[in-house]
Amino acid sequence: ANGVIVVTTKKGRVGRPIVSYNLSTTFRQRPAYSDRAINVMNSAERIRFSRDLVAQHYQFPTDMNLVGYEGLLTKLYNHELSDEQFAREVEQLETLNTDWFDLLTQNTVSHSHTVSISGGSSEANYYASIGYTRDNDVIWDDNNERYTAALNLNTNLTHWMRASLSVKGNVSSRRYYQQDLSPMQYAYNTTRALPAFDENGEYFYFLKRKPGGMEPQYFNYNILNELENSSYDQRGSGLSITANLQFNLTSWLNASAI
């Protein structure tokens, strides 16, 4: 899509100094399983669905992460669980209902502040401002901070020469997650019959299969741990200075130099 960017330059005003403050806020609401647009099975429904697949002798994909009911069933077949242990752990999973949206997203308020001062006389005027913006995404610990400053000066050096100076600077920092983690997609697609924490309140890790490769390889995985230790931190800054001289040589001839 085509777009137009409009850049507006603030100029000082004639008169005594005027100080102004602007505040803007934005509220973002996180998704929830109760939202009408989200239709995801709860733990009991997911376990029932898995049981139906097993009863129909469904062949699960070989590259599938064996978690939830399928993971317990594999342990039962491998004699790692007794029938009683299997039944007890399945019953626990049926009431688990892990709220991935609550763990991975949050309601956020973003805010932007600007303080400016302007003033001057018929011979010279000024405008100065400082600003701060904090933009918070609904994804856990995904945010953007930006500090800005600007100064514009205009003065009549003589009746035929005018000078102006513009200084603008900014400092920004951004924290965001690795794209392959995709917390929102994870919350939509991951079974609620998978715990995020173990019985001791520590992160629960499951064996996740690495994509590709001839031989299957697995690694311990918990998305909360990944988000804590795999974020990107990006910093940047910028400074621009523009000076301009305008010459009114005659009533019909003007010149300028930057």
What are the language-model segments listed below?
Residues 14, 110, 121-122, 158-160, ...:
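Outer-membrane beta-barrel channels and translocator barrels
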Residues 1-20, 110-112, 125, 131-133:
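A beta-strand signature from Gram-negative outer-membrane beta-barrel systems
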Residues 13-96, 107, 137-144, 148, ...:
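Surface-exposed loop/interface segments of Gram-negative outer-membrane beta-barrel transport/assembly proteins
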Residues 88-118, 122:
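Outer-membrane beta-barrel transmembrane domain signature of Gram-negative proteins
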Residues 253:
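An active-site-proximal structural segment forming one wall of the substrate-binding cleft
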Residues 129-131, 248-250, 258:
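Acidic/polar N-terminal loop/beta-strand segments that form early-domain functional surfaces
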Residues 9, 115-121, 149-155, 241-247:
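Residues on the lipid-exposed face of transmembrane beta-strands in outer-membrane beta-barrel proteins
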